[in-house]
Amino acid sequence: MDFLEAEGGWNLSFSGSGYMGLYHVGVTQCLRQRAPRLIQGARRFYGSSSGALNAMAIVFGKSADFACSNLLDLVKLVERLSLGIFHPAYGPAEHIRKKLYENLPDNCHILASQRLGISMTRWPDGKNFIVTDFATRDEFIQALICTLYLPLYCGVIPPAFRGQRFIDGALSNNLPFSDCPTTITVSPFNGTVDICPQNISHSLFELTAFNASFQISTRNFFRGLKSVFPPKPEVVADHCRQGYLDALRFLERRGLTKEPVLWSLVSKEPPALVEGPRGTGHDQGQKTGPTVRWDIPNVLVKDVPNFELLSPELEAALRKACKRDFWTRVQCSVPGKVLAYLLLPCTLPFEYAYFRSRRLMEWLPEAPDDLDWMRSILKSTTLEVYSMAKSWLLRLGSPPGTRADSGLLRQQRGTAPSGNRPLNHRWFPGMD
């Protein structure tokens, strides 16, 4: 890998993946343990949505226990709720904001500036922004909330950042700088990414959307469902372990580790060295060296009888984060679930009123700005609809000859409709 020879000559980019974001934690732990130079010498860490949280954890030097416990706490919260993500108590943005204020240091904005790049989508034009400079701690936390804010899933009013409204960065740029030859990309979805799961059966079809490529397969489809509808904590933990194994495969195929760990899991001795130029299959588009060891096997979590031998720290963090207290075990048991559903007609109205009232009280300080924004959006939409209706009615009521003459006159004058004129976009300071 030529670009790894220069210190600070590469970046790491983590895709948005919702609850599948624990996959990034496994990848990060493998890089820290097997190839720490890739983490220590990286110039910048980019991320969108949940990938930005993992990039933040790397910049601040957070342990695997910190990342696993915070994400799996939210998964266990959804597991306890009788209606899952549809329960009125479910508020991912509020939960993450609270955790950020509790755990981030006072100088987090200074530590993150020029080291962390957060992808955000401006509402309503959908333009992508990558913010790398943060003025205050509150502004940094607000940027993280913006890149995590999936419309309707997290709420209906997009959060504000520097006077504008932003939503999930994965909707416009899911894998920042993935086309840069010095960027190592990571995604829990199979596609043209450096570190990602490898499907057993290869798909001939590929979907390119949101600046990322995904193979069209049933496995990717179910991974997408798990990213918004979290499964049991143990299943999410297995995706974290798979991230560790996929990162290890990436390192061994490119000769960045000396020990043939993956071959020791499936056989006693590795075969003869098989090197070849970059192929056109799963790893197409990866920015690495001239040769790749394609003989390195793809190992799944089920093939590893004792994951603790590979990474004791990660395994201990996952087991600790998956533990449930007594009351949670009662709620998640079959009798507890049956009782919760039987009492749902009685408890749901009170729970709905309580949680909605609490969110209303929390929203009141931001109500004036949000109402002004809603009024401006309604006004601009009304004027646009009125203008379109007016022009349509005028064209409908004018004779055909008049419409042709007006079009010819405009063509002779060399004017064009205003909709074809280029727009001037304003970028934030510190943008790449």
Curated annotation (Swiss-Prot):
Keywords: Hydrolase, Lipid degradation, Lipid metabolism. Gene3D superfamilies: Cytosolic phospholipase A2 catalytic domain. Residues 404-423 are annotated as: Disordered. GO terms for biological process: lipid catabolic process. It catalyses: a triacylglycerol + H2O = a diacylglycerol + a fatty acid + H(+). One of its GO terms (molecular function) is triacylglycerol lipase activity. Residues 12-181 form the PNPLA domain. A motif (GXSXG) lies at residues 47-51. The active site is at S49, D168. The keyword Metal-binding does not apply. A motif (DGA/G) lies at residues 168-170. InterPro entries: Acyl_Trfase/lysoPLipase, PLPL, PNPLA_dom. A motif (GXGXXG) lies at residues 16-21. The keyword Hydrolase applies. Has abundant triacylglycerol lipase activity. This is Patatin-like phospholipase domain-containing protein 5.
